[in-house]
C-alpha cells in the first residue's frame, strides 16, 4: 500500500498523492492509540513506518507534506481534549465564538506538533535516506530525538513519543537518559521495521535483538529499584471537585474554603503528616498577614498544609504551592514556571484578539526556574499542572535534593483523555527520578505512584475525594538524574561523525 515508484518515475504513481496523505493521517491516528487512555504501547513501534517508508521515495517537499499529514493525524487526535474548553459562556463568550476558539486552539497545537514530524520528514528525505541503511537509521533516530528536545523547550509542548510507553510500556528506560531513551528505542524499532521491509536482512536481526534487549533491560531496571528505607511519610490529599467555571465565582470561592477546610480536618483526624491540595485550590491572592479559617485550622492541628493558591508579586501574581508549617506560617513556596499559553498568559501579539480567554484580573508571572521547595521532611520536587510534561523541570529539583514529588493540577474542564495523559507524564517523572509521587488534582485523576512506575492508587474523576497516601523519602540517583540527557549529545556526535566520513570519502 505504501510503496511508491522511485522519484524518477513519478508519473507512474500507484496511489494518488491525496490518497497517500489521507493514509498517512490514518497512520498517525493509529499511532495515537499508543497514548493514554488506550495505551496500546506496542503500536508506537510500527506507527511511524509508513512515514519513514515515504521519506525514501518522495522528494523532500512532498515528504514534508507527508510528515505534516502524519502529524495532524497523530497530534490532532491526541489533543482532542482541547475541545473540552467549549463552552466558554461562563466568561461571557457566546456559543459560536466559543466553539470556534476551542477548535482554533486545537488546530494551532496540532499544527505545532505536525511541524515537528514534517521537519523530520523533510530532513530525512533531503539528507537521511541518501546514506547507507545503518547511517539512515542513525539519522532517523537522532533527528526525531533532537527535534523533540527542541520542541520540549517551547511553550506548546505536551506530546512526546516517550508518552506512548506510559504507564505500561518501556517506562523504565527513562532512568537512563530521560524521555530521549524511550523515544530513541521507539524510533529505532520503527526504522528497523522499515529497513526490514526493504529486504535488509541485517535489519531483521537487529530488530529482534533491539526488541529483546529493550524489553529485558526494562525488566531488569524495574526489579533493581532499591527498597525503601526510613520512616514512611503519610500525605493526605484532597480532590476538591469544584469546576473552574464555578470556583472562580463568589459562591465557588466560598465552597472552596468549605471543602478544603473540611478535607483538612478529616485527614488530620486520620493521622496524616501533611495535607496536599490541588493547583489553585483557593483561587484568591493569599494574604500572609491576615488570619483566615485555613491558617487557624493549621495552627490548631499543627499539621503542615501544602496549599495551591496565588501570591501577589511585582507586576502581577504567581500561581503557587505554599508550604504552611504547623504554625500556619509560610516556610516555603514554589511559583509555577511553565504557564499554560492562552489560559494563564496571553502572548503580546495575541493580546488584543484573545484577552477575554483569561479569567485573571492581573497577569500571571512565571516563577524562577531555580526554586527549591523545602518541607519538614527535606526538599520536595513540585510540578504544577503543565510542568509534568517537562522532564528538565523535575530533574533540576531532583539534583537539588528533591526526595519525593508533589504533582498538583486543576485538569478541569478536560475529561478522560487529558487526565490519563497527564497521569502518564507523572508516571514517567516518578520513574526517571526514582521517586515516590503524590498527584493531587481538582477533578481527577489523583494518584499515588511508586518509584517503579506502578500506580498504587488512582481516584475516580469528577468526585470529591480525600485519601491518605503512604510514601517514602528517597535520595537515590538514576543515570538521568546525575548526567541528564547524555544520549542526545552522543547521537549527535555519531551523526556528525557520519557526515564527516561521508565528506572524506567524496
From Swiss-Prot:
Location of this chain's protein in the cell: Cell inner membrane
Cellular component GO terms, alphabetical: plasma membrane
Protein's organism: Thermosynechococcus vestitus (strain NIES-2133 / IAM M-273 / BP-1)
TM region positions: 10-30, 33-53, 57-77, 105-125, 139-159, 176-196, 205-225, 483-500
Domain of life: Bacteria
Pfam families referenced in this protein's UniProt entry, alphabetically: CN_hydrolase, LNT_N
One record GO biological process: lipoprotein biosynthetic process
List of catalytic residues: 279 (proton acceptor), 336, 385 (nucleophile)
Record function comment: Catalyzes the phospholipid dependent N-acylation of the N-terminal cysteine of apolipoprotein, the last step in lipoprotein maturation.
Membrane topology term: Multi-pass membrane protein
HAMAP family per record: Lnt (MF_01148)
EC nos: 2.3.1.269
InterPro entries given in the database record: Apolipo_AcylTrfase, C-N_Hydrolase, C-N_Hydrolase_sf, LNT_N
Pathway: Protein modification; lipoprotein biosynthesis (N-acyl transfer)
Main subcellular localisation: membrane
Family statement drawn from the similarity comment of this UniProt entry: Belongs to the CN hydrolase family. Apolipoprotein N-acyltransferase subfamily.
Keywords: Acyltransferase, Cell inner membrane, Cell membrane, Membrane, Transferase, Transmembrane, Transmembrane helix
Positions of the CN hydrolase domain: 238-473
Protein name as annotated: Apolipoprotein N-acyltransferase
Single annotated GO MF: N-acyltransferase activity
Lineage of the organism: Bacteria, Bacillati, Cyanobacteriota, Cyanophyceae, Acaryochloridales
Amino acid at each position: 500500500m505504501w510503496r511508491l515508484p522511485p522519484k524518477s518515475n513519478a508519473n507512474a504513481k500507484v496511489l494518488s498523492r491525496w490518497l497517500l496523505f489521507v493514509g498517512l493521517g490514518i497512520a498517525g491516528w493509529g499511532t495515537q492509540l499508543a497514548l493514554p487512555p488506550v495505551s496500546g504501547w506496542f503500536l508506537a513501534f510500527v506507527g511511524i513506518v509508513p512515514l519513514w517508508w515515504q521519506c525514501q521515495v518522495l522528494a523532500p517537499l512532498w515528504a514534508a507534506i507527508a510528515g505534516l499529514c502524519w502529524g495532524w493525524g497523530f497530534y490532532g487526535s491526541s489533543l482532542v481534549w482541547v475541545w473540552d474548553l467549549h463552552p466558554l459562556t461562563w466568561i461571557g463568550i457566546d456559543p459560536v465564538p466559543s466553539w470556534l476558539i476551542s477548535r482554533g486552539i486545537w488546530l494551532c497545537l496540532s499544527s505545532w506538533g505536525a511541524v515537528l514530524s514534517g521537519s523530520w520528514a523533510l530532513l530525512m528525505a533531503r539528507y537521511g535516506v541518501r546514506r547507507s541503511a545503518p547511517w539512515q537509521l542513525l539519522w532517523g533516530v537522532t533527528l526525531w530525538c533532537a527535534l523533540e528536545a527542541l520542541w520540549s523547550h517551547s511553550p506548546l509542548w505536551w506530546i512526546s513519543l516517550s508518552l506512548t510507553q506510559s504507564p505500561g510500556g518501556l517506562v523504565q528506560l527513562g532512568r537512563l537518559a530521560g524521555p530521549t531513551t524511550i523515544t530513541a528505542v521507539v524510533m529505532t524499532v520503527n526504522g528497523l521495521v522499515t529497513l526490514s521491509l526493504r529486504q535488509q536482512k541485517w535489519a531483521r536481526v537487529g530488530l529482534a535483538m533491539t526488541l529483546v534487549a529493550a524489553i529485558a533491560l526494562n525488566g531488569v531496571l524495574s526489579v533493581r529499584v532499591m527498597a525503601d528505607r526510613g520512616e514512611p511519610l503519610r500525605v493526605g490529599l484532597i480532590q476538591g471537585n469544584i469546576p473552574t467555571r464555578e470556583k472562580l465565582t463568589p459562591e465557588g470561592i466560598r465552597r472552596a474554603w468549605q471543602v478544603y477546610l473540611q478535607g483538612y480536618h478529616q485527614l488530620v483526624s486520620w493521622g496524616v503528616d501533611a495535607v496536599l491540595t490541588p493547583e489553585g485550590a483557593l483561587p484568591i491572592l493569599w494574604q500572609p498577614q491576615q488570619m483566615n479559617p485555613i491558617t487557624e485550622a493549621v495552627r490548631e492541628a499543627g499539621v503542615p498544609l501544602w496549599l495551591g493558591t496565588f501570591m501577589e508579586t511585582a507586576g502581577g501574581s504567581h500561581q503557587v504551592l505554599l508550604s504552611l508549617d504547623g504554625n500556619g506560617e509560610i516556610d516555603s513556596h514554589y511559583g509555577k514556571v511553565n504557564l499554560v499559553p492562552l489560559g494563564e498568559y496571553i502572548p503580546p501579539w495575541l493580546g488584543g484578539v484573545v484577552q477575554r480567554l483569561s479569567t485573571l484580573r492581573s497577569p500571571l508571572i512565571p516563577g524562577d526556574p531555580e526554586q527549591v521547595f523545602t518541607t519538614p521532611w527535606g526538599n520536595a520536587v513540585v510540578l504544577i499542572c503543565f510542568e509534568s510534561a517537562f522532564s528538565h523541570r523535575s530533574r533540576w529539583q531532583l539534583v537539588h535534593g528533591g526526595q519525593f514529588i508533589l504533582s498538583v493540577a486543576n485538569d478541569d474542564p478536560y475529561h478522560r483523555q487529558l487526565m490519563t495523559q497527564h497521569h502518564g507524564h507523572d508516571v514517567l517523572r516518578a520513574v526517571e527520578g526514582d521517586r515516590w509521587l503524590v498527584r493531587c488534582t481538582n477533578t481527577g485523576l489523583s494518584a499515588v505512584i511508586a518509584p517503579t512506575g506502578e500506580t498504587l492508587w488512582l481516584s475516580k474523576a469528577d468526585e470529591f475525594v480525600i485519601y491518605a497516601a503512604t510514601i517514602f523519602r528517597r535520595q537515590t540517583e538514576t543515570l538521568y538524574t546525575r548526567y541528564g540527557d547524555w544520549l542526545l549529545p552522543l547521537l549527535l556526535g555519531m551523526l556528525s561523525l557520519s557526515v564527516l566520513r561521508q565528506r572524506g570519502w567524496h
